A protein has these predicted regions:
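Acidic, Ala/Val/Gly-enriched low-complexity intrinsically disordered segments
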Residues: 10-16, 23
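Juxtamembrane helix-loop boundaries in multi-pass membrane proteins
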Residues: 32-65, 81, 85, 107-132, ...
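Helix-coil boundary and interhelical linker segments in multi-pass alpha-helical membrane proteins
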Residues: 66-80, 137-147, 195-209, 257-268, ...
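Transmembrane alpha-helix boundary signature
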Residues: 99-107, 135-146, 166-171
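Alpha-helical transmembrane segments in multipass membrane proteins, preferentially the mid-helix core
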Residues: 162-166, 196-198, 221-230, 252-259, ...
Length: 358
C-alpha cells in the first residue's frame, strides 16, 4: 500500500511540506505518516555554527604571517597584512553581533552548542579569535589597552569554561569515542597558546609564560587520546573537516615561543618545524578520507595551522639569516590555500549552503 493511502487529518492535508511514512518490514504496509511543513525549520540565525569563527581565525593568522614577512622590507607586504587584518576584524565584528543576537533570541540553541562534544569545542573559536585580534592589533593601537584588557579577560574566562567541560568529559569517560576529534585541542591547548600571545601583548609576560606551559601540558594529555582515535580509522564524515586542527599544536606552539622569546635561536624553530611536518604527513596520508566529503566551512580548520607554519618559517629565515625567498614562498603558498578556501566558501554562501540545513 503506498504511503499516500494513509489518511491524514484535514489540517495536515492542507499544509505544503515533506511527507514521510513508516513501513512495517514484515507486511510492507505503511504504519504512520508525518509531515514537515515548509517554512517551519529553524531560523537561519539559530543554525549559525560556531565553526564560522575559523574563517576569522585563519585570516588573522594570514595577516600575522604577512606582517612578519614585512620585516624584510618586501614591497606590498605591509599593505597586504593591513588589508587582510581589516577584513578579518570586520568579519569578526559581524559574527560577534550575530552570536550576541543568537544568544538572546535562540538561547536554547547556544546551550545545545555548548553541551555538544564537538560544537562545544568549536565554540572556543569565539574567544580565540578575540584574543588573537588583541595580540595583533594592540601593539599598533596602545590607546585601546583598557578595552583589550577587558576583552582578553572575558575571552579567557569563556575559554576556561569550555576547556573545563572538554577536559572533564575526557577525564571521566563521558565523551563518546566517536566524538573524539582534533577539535578537542582548541579549548585547552589553543586557549592557552593564543591566550599567552594576548597576555604578552598586554605586557604580562610572566602570566603569558605560565599559560604557555599549561597549554603544552594540555597538548600532552590530549595527544595520545586523539591520535589513538585517528589511528583507529576514519572519522564520521561530518567530523572529517576538523582533521585540520591536528596540524595546529606544533606550529602554533613554536609561533608563541617565538613571540614570547624574541631571541629564540633559529635552530629551536627548526625543531618545531620538524615536529610540524610529522603531523602534516599524517594528515596528508588520510587525504582520501577528508576529500571524500563535500566542501564545507569546516575545512577552514586547515587555515590557521598552515598560517602559523608559514609564520614560523618566516621567523626561522629571519633569525637564521637564510634566503628571504624561502619565507616569501611559504607565505605565498599559505595565501593560495586561504584564497581557495575563501572562494569555495563564497560559492557556498551564494548557493545558500553555508549554514547547516534546518
Amino acid at each position: 500500500m503506498p504511503c499516500n493511502r494513509i489518511s491524514l487529518s484535514a489540517p495536515a492535508r492542507d499544509v505544503a511540506g515533506t511527507y514521510t511514512c513508516s513501513v512495517n518490514p514484515k507486511t510492507s504496509q505503511p504504519t504512520s505518516a508525518t509531515i514537515t511543513p515548509i517554512g517551519t525549520g529553524r531560523h537561519w540565525l539559530a543554525r549559525l555554527p560556531p565553526g564560522l569563527f575559523a574563517i576569522v581565525f585563519g585570516l588573522l593568522g594570514l595577516a600575522g604571517a604577512w606582517r612578519r614577512l614585512s620585516a624584510f622590507n618586501l614591497p606590498l607586504t605591509e599593505d597586504i597584512s593591513a588589508a587582510v587584518l581589516s577584513l578579518a576584524t570586520g568579519l569578526l565584528e559581524l559574527l560577534l553581533v550575530l552570536w550576541i543576537i543568537k544568544f538572546f533570541r535562540h538561547r536554547d540553541e547556544v546551550k545545545k552548542d555548548f553541551a555538544h562534544p564537538v560544537n562545544g569545542a568549536l565554540l572556543s573559536l569565539l574567544p580565540l579569535t578575540v584574543m588573537l585580534t588583541v595580540s595583533l592589533c594592540l601593539p599598533s593601537m596602545p590607546q585601546y589597552f583598557q578595552l583589550a584588557s577587558g576583552l582578553t579577560l572575558a575571552a579567557l574566562v569563556l575559554q576556561g569554561a569550555i576547556a573545563w567541560r572538554v577536559v572533564s568529559q575526557l577525564a571521566t569517560g563521558a565523551l563518546p569515542a566517536d566524538m573524539v576529534t582534533p577539535a578537542l585541542y582548541l579549548p585547552p591547548v589553543g586557549g592557552g597558546l593564543i591566550g599567552a600571545m594576548a597576555l604578552n601583548a598586554l605586557g604580562l609576560h610572566g602570566w603569558a609564560v605560565l599559560l604557555f606551559g599549561m597549554a603544552l601540558g594540555a597538548w600532552a594529555l590530549l595527544e595520545a587520546r586523539i591520535l589513538n582515535r585517528l589511528f583507529a580509522g576514519a572519522l564520521a564524515p561530518p567530523l572529517r573537516p576538523t582533521i585540520g586542527v591536528e596540524l595546529a599544536p606544533a606550529p602554533v606552539s613554536m609561533l608563541v615561543a617565538a613571540t614570547l622569546w624574541p631571541d629564540l635561536p633559529a635552530d629551536v624553530l627548526l625543531v618545531g618545524l620538524g615536529v610540524s611536518c610529522g603531523a602534516l604527513v599524517a594528515v596528508l596520508a588520510r587525504w582520501r578520507w577528508w576529500t571524500a566529503v563535500p566542501f564545507s566551512a569546516g575545512f577552514w580548520s586547515f587555515s590557521f595551522p598552515l598560517a602559523a607554519l608559514a609564520s614560523v618559517a618566516v621567523e626561522a629565515v629571519r633569525r637564521g639569516g637564510w634566503p628571504v625567498l624561502v619565507a616569501y614562498v611559504a607565505v605565498l603558498m599559505v595565501s593560495a590555500v586561504i584564497v581557495y578556501l575563501a572562494a569555495r566558501t563564497l560559492l557556498l554562501l551564494v548557493r545558500g549552503r553555508l549554514l547547516p540545513p534546518g
